[in-house]
A protein has these predicted regions:
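Mature extracellular/passenger domains of Gram-negative fimbrial/pilin and adhesin proteins
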Residues: 2-6, 19-175
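Bacterial N-terminal signal peptides
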Residues: 9-17
Length: 175
């Protein structure tokens, strides 16, 4: 084999290697994902909660339409991008006073008065529109805290001894 034929053989062999690389298949990788907004949930202790009011006497209503006020809070745990939480309360109004939530206990003439503890205090009416039954709170440190107060309240007729039992649903929306 002469030295002159070696470059020709190398050129032919190199061409074969290029053809082999060109014969490989190609593809496209596509990546998809979803970026969701943060979420908010009622705090675990507020999902199914019993709030016990202090015992009162019938005579406590002699000079006031309400008695036994008890402060408490309802809160929501939120992710860092949530700025505001709206709490919506829904329950059955009392037949004697539609602003007051119905008492299914044994005491007659009483219902539950729910108040947002602001200055001045603001009743959350059982028979109100959704806007009247809602309160919006800004989040702080990934939490929204709504300060509330509940109390026994006269409805109509004579007040009798017995229990006060009142239930409502709280739902939250957020942004």
């Amino acid at each position: 084999m002469s030295i002159r034929t070696l470059p020709v053989l190398l050129a032919i062999t190199a061409g074969l290697a290029v053809n082999a690389a060109q014969a490989a298949t190609t593809g496209t990788l596509r990546f998809e994902g979803l970026v969701n907004a943060g979420t908010c949930n009622l705090a675990a202790g507020d999902v199914n909660r019993t709030i016990t009011l202090p015992a009162v006497k019938i005579s406590d209503f002699d000079s006031s339409p309400f008695a036994g006020a008890h402060n408490f809070e309802v809160s929501a745990d939120c992710e860092s991008d949530i700025r505001n939480v709206t709490f919506l309360f829904t329950g059955t109004p009392s037949t004697g006073n539609g602003l007051i939530f119905n008492n299914t206990g044994t005491s007659q003439g009483t219902g539950l008065w729910l108040v947002h503890r602001t200055t001045p205090v603001s009743t959350i009416p059982a028979n109100g529109t959704p806007a009247q039954r809602s309160r919006t709170v800004a989040t702080s440190s990934n939490k929204a805290i709504l300060p509330l107060q509940a109390a026994y309240h006269k409805t109509s007729g004579a007040i009798t001894q017995g229990t006060l039992i009142s239930s409502m649903t709280v739902a939250i929306t957020y942004n």
